Design a protein with these regions (language model features):
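Single conserved hydrophobic/aromatic residue that forms the stacking wall/gate
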Residues: 236-244
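Transmembrane alpha-helices
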Residues: 10, 15-22, 144-147, 155-156, ...
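Glycine-rich helix-loop "coupling/hinge" segments at transmembrane-helix boundaries
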Residues: 35-41, 200-228
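Membrane-interfacial helix termini and adjacent extracytoplasmic/periplasmic loops
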Residues: 35-37, 44, 109-139, 170, ...
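Transmembrane-helix boundary motif in ABC transporter permease subunits
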Residues: 1-5, 68-100, 117, 173
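Short membrane-interfacial helix/loop motifs at transmembrane-helix boundaries
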Residues: 20-54, 204-209
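Transmembrane alpha-helical segments of polytopic membrane transport and secretion proteins
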Residues: 1-12, 242
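Amphipathic cytosolic juxtamembrane alpha-helices at the membrane-cytosol interface
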Residues: 2, 65, 89-97, 154-187
Length: 244
């Protein structure tokens, strides 16, 4: 009985730790007062002010565009990489998988600084393009991680049978292989999309002047002082328990 009660208390404390910051943001985003210490009544004017802020809206557009484009390109490259690795010998495939996993094992700040130095050495102009390339780079391993297990579950005999029956390689791939790996591809795309939306550190090191995502824009605004509409903006970008 005591053990069960202790477990419930422990679980309750975990949920409080996870959700208390989000609840605080929700309350403050509806507070009519500009000060955090005083409750000035219920209002939605900060949400209206948020959507009237052109800089925030531009940052939102940049964030969504980066997430969609990087996820699509990373999914395409990652899927092709999985198909290529599946035809390799086991030793070569293991080595390549190890190399592919390095970006996931690295601290984000290491990846961000490395990419920044690479772009500087290449003389690249920092902006939307450098952020997009960076997001594609760190998203590809997550796509491979999602697609590769589906590739390993494939029965090569079905693909070979389709070829023996006169199907072209392209037709056999899209009719036999693609339907089986599609769940992994979709999972990889969603993972890449989420990681891109969630990223701050790598974006911060590879963005140019005048180009912001929601995370970097919020960081810039908070340094100037927290405006009430920032609570509303933070609510949309608040971390889930997965991030915590």
């Amino acid at each position: 009985m005591i053990k069960t009660t202790a477990q419930k208390i422990y679980l309750g404390l975990i949920f409080i730790f996870l959700y208390a910051p989000i609840v605080t943001l929700i309350v403050l985003s509806f507070n009519a007062s500009k000060t955090r210490a005083k409750w000035g009544g219920f209002t939605t004017k900060w949400y209206a002010a948020l959507f009237q802020n052109e800089q925030i809206m531009q940052a939102l557009w940049n964030t969504l565009a980066l997430a969609v484009l990087s996820a699509l390109i990373a999914t395409f490259i990652g899927t092709i990489a999985c198909i290529a690795m599946q035809s390799m010998k086991r030793t070569s495939r293991t080595i390549l998988m190890g190399i592919t996993n390095i970006p996931m094992l690295n601290a984000e700040i290491v990846t961000g600084i490395s990419l920044m130095l690479l772009f500087l050495s290449l003389g690249a102009k920092f902006g939307f393009g450098t952020i997009l390339l960076s997001h594609i780079t760190f998203n590809i391993p997550y796509v491979i991680l999602s697609v590769m297990p589906r590739m390993k579950q494939l029965n090569p005999s079905t693909y070979e049978a389709a070829l023996d029956l006169g199907a072209s390689q392209t037709y056999a791939f899209f009719k036999v292989v693609f339907p089986d790996i599609l769940p992994g591809i979709l999972s990889g795309f969603l993972m890449a999309f989420t990681m891109s939306l969630d990223d701050f550190i790598i974006t911060h090191f590879t963005k140019g002047p005048g180009v912001d995502t929601l995370s970097t824009k919020i960081y810039t605004e908070v340094k100037k002082g927290i405006k009430p509409e920032m609570y509303a903006c933070l609510l949309y970008t608040s971390p889930s328990p997965r991030d915590a």
